[in-house]
Amino acid sequence: MGCTVSAEDKAAAERSKMIDKNLREDGEKAAREVKLLLLGAGESGKSTIVKQMKIIHEDGYSEEECRQYRAVVYSNTIQSIMAIVKAMGNLQIDFADPSRADDARQLFALSCTAEEQGVLPDDLSGVIRRLWADHGVQACFGRSREYQLNDSAAYYLNDLERIAQSDYIPTQQDVLRTRVKTTGIVETHFTFKDLHFKMFDVGGQRSERKKWIHCFEGVTAIIFCVALSAYDLVLAEDEEMNRMHESMKLFDSICNNKWFTDTSIILFLNKKDLFEEKITHSPLTICFPEYTGANKYDEAASYIQSKFEDLNKRKDTKEIYTHFTCATDTKNVQFVFDAVTDVIIKNNLKDCGLF
């Protein structure tokens, strides 16, 4: 008699087993859900990383989606040449060919309607082409650190002939290079290595930062983007503030924030291609007067890396995972994101006591 298990006990044991199973499944599901927060100052490349996730993990942009970016490409191209021509007045640079002054007047007369309609008419593309070929305009472009200019300016202006075709459809690379200021929070979902990612891209300009706070809860990792090439630039919203210094200030507040004690911090030192180009003729001492190294990519990039990593006040318990990136290079982003995912998996296993 003593060995007999009552029907009630059996049912209770089954219920207990089922609860354990559900808890285990919920735990496994939670461990497979990854919430990534993309942070960084304005124009550091966050939105480009999000676009790359669509290209790498979601079959990219369809022809119809690319077509919808045509007006943005036109607008970015028009805004870029206008910014350069406006800066010529401030920097007192003349056109090499005086007749380009007429083209400049035409540019400002035609651009407003073209942008409103999302088009690039032949007369306007001709004006832009002639202006971009002028040596005075090129001299002003060479001094672009002295005013605000899109990173994609030369990319679009050098390819104007293709962009101005009547049957133009933007390529994936054209879409990656588009610049639209992020306002609010953009959420992207994708699956990779059996993990379900939710990625949040947050506006980087100062006015956008107050919107970050409610995204903080339950974040698995933060990807903090820094534009390496911004070391000699000032902010669009505060022309007294060096962009790199602003980025460091922001990284300090994120890295040492009590909200993020247990959050993996991944540092993307981005725009390495632009930095490599720029460092040979624009010294790092503009940003860091104490720098005594060579104005060469490896040495200067390592110095910036150490400046950011040194801001971490919890080095004994918190590791910063740093990667040098070029957000417009799909292969590079794919390689880096693969490494980032491995770190997330490893840290998830640690949290579950399995590593």
From Swiss-Prot:
Binding site for Mg(2+): S47, T182
Pfam family, one: G-alpha
Positions of post-translational ADP-ribosylcysteine modification: C352
UniProtKB keywords: ADP-ribosylation, Cell cycle, Cell division, Cell membrane, Cytoplasm, Cytoskeleton, GTP-binding, Lipoprotein, Magnesium, Membrane, Metal-binding, Myristate, Nucleotide-binding, Palmitate, Transducer
Modified residues (Deamidated glutamine): Q205
Example of a GO biological process term: negative regulation of adenylate cyclase activity
Topological type in the membrane: Lipid-anchor
Lipidated sites in chain (N-myristoyl glycine): G2
Compartments where located: Cytoplasm; Cytoplasm, Cytoskeleton, Microtubule organizing center, Centrosome; Cell membrane; Membrane
Residues with ADP-ribosylarginine modification: R179
Residues anchoring lipid (S-palmitoyl cysteine): C3
Chain intervals for the UniProt region annotation (G2 motif): 174-182
Superkingdom of the source species: Eukaryota
Main location group: cytoplasm
Residue span(s) of domain G-alpha: 32-355
Region spans: G5 motif: 325-330
Span list, region G3 motif: 197-206
Family matches, as PROSITE patterns: G_ALPHA
Binding locations of GTP: 40-47, 176-182, 201-205, 270-273, 327
Gene Ontology CC entries for this record: cell body; centrosome; ciliary basal body; cytoplasm; cytosol; dendrite; extracellular exosome; extracellular vesicle
Region G1 motif, annotated ranges: 35-48
Summary of subunit composition and partner proteins: G proteins are composed of 3 units; alpha, beta and gamma. The alpha chain contains the guanine nucleotide binding site. In this context, interacts with GNB2. Interacts with GPSM1. Interacts with RGS12 and RGS14. Interacts with UNC5B. Interacts (inactive GDP-bound form) with NUCB1 (via GBA motif); the interaction leads to activation of GNAI3. Interacts (inactive GDP-bound form) with CCDC88C/DAPLE (via GBA motif). Interacts (inactive GDP-bound form) with CCDC8A/GIV (via GBA motif). Interacts with CXCR1 and CXCR2.
Record-given protein name: Guanine nucleotide-binding protein G(i) subunit alpha-2
Source organism of the structure: Homo sapiens (Human)
Highest classification ranks of the organism: Eukaryota, Metazoa, Chordata, Craniata, Vertebrata
